[in-house]
Amino acid sequence: MPIAPSTYYDHINREPSRRELRDGELKEHISRVHAANYGVYGARKVWLTLNREGIEVARCTVERLMTKLGLSGTTRGKARRTTIADPATARPADLVQRRFGPPAPNRLWVADLTYVSTWAGFAYVAFVTDAYARRILGWRVASTMATSMVLDAIEQAIWTRQQESVLDLKDVIHHTDRGSQYTSIRFSERLAEAGIQPSVGAVGSSYDNALAETINGLYKTELIKPGKPWRSIEDVELATARWVDWFNHRRLYQYCGDVPPVELEAAYYAQRQRPAAG
């Protein structure tokens, strides 16, 4: 059906509606939040972030506008196992038995390592994570998958807690899979010096250290795969430092009640410092 010229020009010259103006503003905020969080947030986390910032908006509106913008979240793939067991080395008992929900910080630390392909060869990455709030306490990037790398990661974890005046680590269980780096004499001696109890998965399945592998999977999905190709180990190290800071302080983690790990830890300690009611 033909459209009268006056109707056409009225349409293109009309003032935008309030909804259109609001949508335009929200699109800018949505794009900003999505980009600031490594492009990994879906509509739910973008919506939560906007509301945390004081920008009140319905989740369905965020979903609608993200569709228009062509934005979506990421889905974590299946992680590959990296550690290799040493059958000749004695292993500590499994003190965790796949229970990864401790009642407080500094009860269970989990550790694992993964690798990143670069133009200069493989970069190996080790993480130490406190299971209570899924906070990464220590990490290290190295060119070899050696005991020194996991030692550096545990040293950083110990140092992190020392900066927070946590000096007594006797209640900490350090849980890993059967990788030879974690069952070496040097590593076992360092845990003993710190008063940390070692634990190694009993069965040898990925489920034995599922939380640590989850952290590795998020790292690969949120940072490594979107950032390919990686030119050097140094590039991986710098990017990992930024990602860990974001992960701990800004990333909304569903397990933590959709707050960052550091925020959940702070809430735990604040609750303990409150005087009892009555």
UniProtKB/Swiss-Prot annotation:
The keyword RNA-binding appears for this protein: no
Q: Which residues form the Integrase catalytic domain?
A: 101-268
Q: Does the keyword section mention Protease?
A: no
The cross-references to SUPFAM superfamilies, in alphabetical order and at most eight, read:
Ribonuclease H-like (SSF53098)
Its biological purpose: Involved in the transposition of the insertion sequence.
The protein's UniProt keywords, in alphabetical order, are:
DNA recombination, DNA-binding, Transposable element, Transposition
Q: Which species expresses this protein natively?
A: Mycobacterium tuberculosis (strain CDC 1551 / Oshkosh)
Question: This protein is called what?
Answer: Putative transposase for insertion sequence element IS986/IS6110
* Stored Gene3D superfamilies: Ribonuclease H-like superfamily/Ribonuclease H
Q: Where are the transmembrane segments?
A: none
GO biological process terms held by the UniProt record: DNA integration; DNA recombination; transposition
| GO MF terms held by the record | DNA binding
